[in-house]
């Protein structure tokens, strides 16, 4: 990460090794050096989102408690822990901890110092005037002015529990792989189109795929050579598919335009003669007048 320029990353989305399984890919990573690099590369208004599970999630929060904001809960469609089912409840969730050096608050007060947050899935439920005495609750976190201007108000704000099924079959390429759809949701929540996302433990490349699907740039780091190749091949395959889809859409648009052009009226000799006769009739009418 030392080669990444300062202030060039708009979001870190990372699934660090939890250090709870006795295998090579789940070895603990020192957090202090990571925070030093993450905070160096973050651009204004950016966030760091880290997947975790207890007791590792507590370790994550305590590693930077002053910049910890809140947790999302990822509710899985299938539980784990059947080996210990007679001793404790099955587990069907993981935690996503959100950190940022920038405060949460109203954009009119904080400006570019405000942590970026784009709530997903909002629904318009009514209109209200900006001259209303109520100054809070609008989507962009800005205080309402007193101008007589009608704006939309919204409902269906996100709750902290996110339900996403795990990727299965040929799409499941890593033991701790996170769903692409979940990564897309988080990326859209904390970045805008064209921004850059960093995953310094990218595994099979789900974050990279999600970035391609949402129009973001991606930087991925993976120390395991085998999984690096898996991620590289997967991301390149998705990129190729997206380029092909874009090409097909362009061809469809061109064909639609061609079909429209072909439907334009063609003036045959008979049509021109008929128009000439009509013009002659009008000329005769003018002479009579």
Give residue ranges: language-model regions:
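Short glycine-dipeptide loop
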Residues: 42-48, 193-194
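Class I S-adenosyl-L-methionine
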Residues: 2-6, 10-13, 22, 62-285
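A short glycine-rich, Lys/Arg-flanked "PGG" loop and its adjoining helix->strand segment in the class I
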Residues: 29-44
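Short "lid" loop at the C-terminus of a central beta-strand within the Rossmann-like core
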Residues: 18-19, 54-57, 75-77
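A short acidic, amphipathic alpha-helical/loop segment
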Residues: 37, 59-60
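Mobile active-site "lid"/loop adjacent to the S-adenosyl-L-methionine
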Residues: 16-33, 162
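Short, well-ordered alpha-helical microsegments
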Residues: 1, 56-59
């Amino acid at each position: 990460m030392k080669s990444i320029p300062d202030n060039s990353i708009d979001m870190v989305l990372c699934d660090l090794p939890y250090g709870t399984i006795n295998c090579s890919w789940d070895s603990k990573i020192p957090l202090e050096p990571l925070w030093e690099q993450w905070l160096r590369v973050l651009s204004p208004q950016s966030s760091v989102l880290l997947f975790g599970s207890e007791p590792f999630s507590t370790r994550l929060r305590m590693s930077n408690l002053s910049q910890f904001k809140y947790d999302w809960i990822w509710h899985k469609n299938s539980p784990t822990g059947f080996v210990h089912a007679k001793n404790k409840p099955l587990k069907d969730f993981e935690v996503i901890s959100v950190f940022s050096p920038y405060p949460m608050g109203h954009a009119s007060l904080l400006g570019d110092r405000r942590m970026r947050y784009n709530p997903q899935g909002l629904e318009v439920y009514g209109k209200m005037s900006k001259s209303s005495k109520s100054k809070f609750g609008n989507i962009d976190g800005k205080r309402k002015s007193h101008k007589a201007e009608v704006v939309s108000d919204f409902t269906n704000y996100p709750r902290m529990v996110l339900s996403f099924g795990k990727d299965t079959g040929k799409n499941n390429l890593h033991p701790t792989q996170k769903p692409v759809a979940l990564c897309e949701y988080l990326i859209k929540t904390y970045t805008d189109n064209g921004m850059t996302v960093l995953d310094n433990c990218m595994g099979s490349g789900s974050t990279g795929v999600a970035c391609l699907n949402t129009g973001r740039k991606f930087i991925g780091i993976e120390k395991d050579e085998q999984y690096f190749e898996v991620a590289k091949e997967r991301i390149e395959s998705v990129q190729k598919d997206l380029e092909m889809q874009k090409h097909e859409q362009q061809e469809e648009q061109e064909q639609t335009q061609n079909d429209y052009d072909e439907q334009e009226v063609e003036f045959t000799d008979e049509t021109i003669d008929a128009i000439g006769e009509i013009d002659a009739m009008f000329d005769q009418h003018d002479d009579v007048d």
